[in-house]
């Protein structure tokens, strides 16, 4: 009996029992269907290693990749009124907010931070599409205003990463009001002669595209990002025609003069450093090892003295 209980039963249990495996070890590429190991995907900045599809990236992950050594300071954003319209569809608006905060571990759909990028001080803002579709509400409006005011106060450029489905339905006209508010915030930067660079990521649509996302001094997009006001499906149903291949995608907009660059995520930081320093009138960033410093005058005199004999005669050329 002891042999059965001590050896056979544990052996059977070990064979038939399922190991508990974390659910987030693997991710499936939505473009090509390849299963990607989470660490491999994270090291590649959430870009598929098979088809180069750019997946969503959280604001904190973007800032970690953007700022020097991943170090940044989050800027506090004023909190707006909670559920001012008492909106309810299938769920109450506060319940949707609570679910989004639980799922993302973030307070709202935009994060604002400051730090250094290539030794250049900047202010950055990024939208989180996983938080209610990155929708533009009163908080997002407050965040952009806070970012612009901080940039003006410190005389720093502002870099914004957009990712949104448009205005937040649950806030109604108060959400649409953020379009002129954010436009005024961008104008503050222009009056202060500070660069405003927008990186459009997939997707950037609706009222976000119609306001602050297309008001930058430079517009850069990630590959194959959908950038539009009304989506292609809505347009096709309205005009009853099939749209061209790649319509409203980043490459299409670049060909038609709506964008300045389409840049791979892996090269985005270097691109932003170059453009930011150029617009700020700074010298190009030094890449690689810095050159050895020039010798000081006292060092040069010491070196000359070591090459001279005790009688003061110059060294022999033999």
Curated annotation (Swiss-Prot):
Q: Where found, per UniProt?
A: Cytoplasm
Class of this enzyme? transferase
* Keywords from the UniProt entry: ATP-binding, Cytoplasm, Fatty acid biosynthesis, Fatty acid metabolism, Lipid biosynthesis, Lipid metabolism, Metal-binding, Nucleotide-binding, Transferase, Zinc, Zinc-finger
CoA carboxyltransferase N-terminal domain mapped to chain residues: 25-294
Required cofactors, per record?
Answer: Zn(2+)
Regarding protein family, the annotation reads: Belongs to the AccD/PCCB family.
Q: Which HAMAP family match?
A: AcetylCoA_CT_beta
The UniProt function text for this chain reads:
Component of the acetyl coenzyme A carboxylase (ACC) complex. Biotin carboxylase (BC) catalyzes the carboxylation of biotin on its carrier protein (BCCP) and then the CO(2) group is transferred by the transcarboxylase to acetyl-CoA to form malonyl-CoA.
Q: What is this protein called?
A: Acetyl-coenzyme A carboxylase carboxyl transferase subunit beta
């Amino acid at each position: 009996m002891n042999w059965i209980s001590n050896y056979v039963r544990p052996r059977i249990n070990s064979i038939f029992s399922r190991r508990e495996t974390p659910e987030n070890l693997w991710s499936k590429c939505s473009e090509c269907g390849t299963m990607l190991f989470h660490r491999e995907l994270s090291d590649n900045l959430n870009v598929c290693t098979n088809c180069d599809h750019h997946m969503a990236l959280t604001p904190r992950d973007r800032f970690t990749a953007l700022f020097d050594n991943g170090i940044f300071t989050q800027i506090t954003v004023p909190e707006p009124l909670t559920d001012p319209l008492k909106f309810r569809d299938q769920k109450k608006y506060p319940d949707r907010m609570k679910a989004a905060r639980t799922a993302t571990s973030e307070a709202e759909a935009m994060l604002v931070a400051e730090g250094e990028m290539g030794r250049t001080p900047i202010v950055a803002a990024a939208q989180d599409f996983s938080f209610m579709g990155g929708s533009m509400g009163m908080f997002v409006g407050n965040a952009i205003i806070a970012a612009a005011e901080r940039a003006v106060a410190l005389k720093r450029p502002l870099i914004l990463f957009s990712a949104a489905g448009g205005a937040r339905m649950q806030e109604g006209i108060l959400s649409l009001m953020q379009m002129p508010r954010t436009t005024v915030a961008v104008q503050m930067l222009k009056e202060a002669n500070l660069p405003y660079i927008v990186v459009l990521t997939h997707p950037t649509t609706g009222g976000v595209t119609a306001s602050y996302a297309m008001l930058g001094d430079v517009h850069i997009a990630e590959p194959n990002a959908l950038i539009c006001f009304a989506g292609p499906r809505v347009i096709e149903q309205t005009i009853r025609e099939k749209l061209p291949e790649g319509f409203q995608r980043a490459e299409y907009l670049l060909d038609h003069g709506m964008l300045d660059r389409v840049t791979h995520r892996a090269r985005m930081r270097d691109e932003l450093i170059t453009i930011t320093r150029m617009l700020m009138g700074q010298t190009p960033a030094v890449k690689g090892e810095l050159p050895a410093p020039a010798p000081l005058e006292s060092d040069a005199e010491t070196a000359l003295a070591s090459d001279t004999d005790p009688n003061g005669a110059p060294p022999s050329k033999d």
